[in-house]
Swiss-Prot record:
<dbReference type="GO" id="GO:0016853">
    <property type="term" value="F:isomerase activity"/>
</dbReference>
<dbReference type="GO" id="GO:0006631">
    <property type="term" value="P:fatty acid metabolic process"/>
</dbReference>
<comment type="pathway">
    <text>Lipid metabolism; fatty acid metabolism.</text>
</comment>
<dbReference type="GO" id="GO:0009636">
    <property type="term" value="P:response to toxic substance"/>
</dbReference>
<dbReference type="InterPro" id="IPR010451">
    <property type="entry name" value="Acetoacetate_decarboxylase"/>
</dbReference>
<comment type="function">
    <text>Is involved in a saturation metabolic pathway of polyunsaturated fatty acids, that detoxifies unsaturated fatty acids and generates hydroxy fatty acids, oxo fatty acids, conjugated fatty acids such as conjugated linoleic acids (CLAs), and partially saturated trans-fatty acids as intermediates. CLA-DC catalyzes the migration of the carbon-carbon double bond in 10-oxo-(12Z)-octadecenoate to produce 10-oxo-(11E)-octadecenoate, during linoleate metabolism.</text>
</comment>
<dbReference type="GO" id="GO:0016829">
    <property type="term" value="F:lyase activity"/>
</dbReference>
<keyword id="KW-0413">Isomerase</keyword>
<comment type="similarity">
    <text>Belongs to the ADC family.</text>
</comment>
<keyword id="KW-0963">Cytoplasm</keyword>
<keyword id="KW-0216">Detoxification</keyword>
<dbReference type="InterPro" id="IPR023375">
    <property type="entry name" value="ADC_dom_sf"/>
</dbReference>
<dbReference type="GO" id="GO:0005737">
    <property type="term" value="C:cytoplasm"/>
</dbReference>
<dbReference type="Pfam" id="PF06314">
    <property type="entry name" value="ADC"/>
</dbReference>
<protein>
    <recommendedName>
        <fullName>CLA biosynthesis isomerase</fullName>
        <ecNumber>5.3.3.-</ecNumber>
    </recommendedName>
</protein>
Length: 281
C-alpha cells in the first residue's frame, strides 16, 4: 500500500547508480567564440578548445524515471591539466519522465537542468532533425545527414567515447551547492563544490554525418550567446547503457565568483526578478 512514509529500503535505494540506458539521437559539435565560451567556465576548470558539443536524444530506459527527450550543450574542459571531461552549460528535458529527470539531475548531481516546452527528434532514412522550444522560441534546430563530417578531424576527439561495442569512461564536471535562507527570507549560496561524475557507456551504433545548426535566445535561455562560427559535424548514435558509477569531490570553490556562472542554466529570470512573468491563457 502506498504511503507518504518511505520504507527503509526505499531510502537506501534512493537514486542508486542512476543509468540512462537505451539512449539514441543526434550528437554534434561546432566551433564558437573562444573568449565567450571561456568566460562561461568557472574556475578551476579550464577550457580545452573553442568548441561547443551537444546532443538531442531520447532516453528510452532511465532507471529513475519514465522515458524522456533531452538536449544538452557542453564544453570540453580540464581540471588541473590532468583530468579531462565535459562541462555541461545547460540541459533541457521534455516528456513523461522529464520532471523526474530534472529533479534527479539538478538536486541529486548538481546538473544544470530545466524543463523544455517541447523537444522533437525525428529520423527518416539517412537524415534526422531535432528542435528544442521554450518560452516562445525555437532555441535549437539541428539537422544531421549521414555521410561526411563537416570537419573530419573532429572525430578524433570522440573516437574513444564512440567506439562501437567497447565500454568507454567519461568524466562530467558539475558544481553542487547549498541554498541557505536567512531569518528575513533572503537566500545565499554556500558550500559550493566542484565534483566529477564518472560515466561508463556502451555505444552500439554510430553514424557520422553533416551538421546544420541554428540557435536562438530568450532571456531565460541565451543559446545564441554561443554563436556558431563553423559546424564541425554530427552523428546519429545509440548508447545501449550509460551508467554513473562514481562521483569524485574535487574542490571547494568561492561562491561569489562561481554562482553567477551557474544560475541561468538552472533557474529562470523570475527567480531574480518578480516582474519577469509569462501569461498564457
Amino acid at each position: 500500500m502506498a504511503s507518504f512514509i518511505a520504507s527503509d529500503q526505499d531510502v537506501k535505494n534512493f537514486l542508486t547508480a542512476p543509468s540512462m540506458n537505451d539512449q539514441e539521437g543526434i550528437g554534434f559539435a561546432y566551433a564558437t567564440d573562444e573568449a565567450v565560451l571561456k568566460a562561461l567556465i568557472p574556475a578551476p576548470l579550464k577550457l580545452m578548445a573553442p568548441v561547443v558539443c551537444g546532443y538531442v536524444v531520447h532516453m528510452g530506459k532511465p532507471t529513475f524515471s519514465a522515458p524522456y527527450l533531452e538536449e544538452s550543450l557542453f564544453a570540453l574542459v580540464s581540471y588541473k591539466d590532468k583530468m579531462m571531461g565535459a562541462y555541461p552549460i545547460n540541459l533541457l528535458l521534455h516528456g513523461p519522465g522529464a520532471e523526474s529527470g530534472v529533479i534527479a539531475g539538478r538536486e541529486g548531481a548538481g546538473i544544470p537542468k530545466k524543463l523544455a516546452d517541447d523537444i522533437e527528434l525525428r529520423r527518416n532514412d539517412n537524415s534526422a532533425t531535432a528542435t528544442v522550444e521554450r518560452h516562445g522560441k525555437t532555441l535549437l534546430n539541428v539537422s544531421w545527414t549521414a555521410g561526411e563530417l563537416n570537419d573530419p578531424s573532429i572525430m578524433k576527439q570522440f573516437a574513444g567515447q564512440l567506439a562501437l561495442g567497447k565500454e568507454a569512461e567519461m568524466n562530467s564536471f558539475f558544481y553542487k551547492y547549498d541554498i541557505d535562507q536567512h531569518e528575513d527570507g533572503t537566500n545565499h549560496f554556500s558550500n559550493v563544490q566542484l565534483v566529477a561524475t564518472q560515466l561508463r557507456s556502451l555505444a552500439d551504433q554510430v553514424e557520422p554525418g553533416n551538421l546544420s545548426i541554428q540557435l536562438e535566445s530568450t532571456d531565460d535561455d541565451p543559446f545564441g550567446e554561443l554563436k556558431v562560427l563553423k559546424p564541425l559535424g554530427a552523428a546519429w548514435f545509440h548508447f545501449d547503457t550509460s551508467v554513473m558509477f562514481n562521483t569524485l569531490k574535487l574542490d571547494e570553490v568561492d561562491a561569489a565568483t562561481t554562482m553567477p556562472k551557474l544560475l541561468t542554466g538552472r533557474y529562470d529570470r523570475s527567480f531574480f526578478n518578480p516582474k519577469a512573468a509569462t501569461y498564457i491563457i
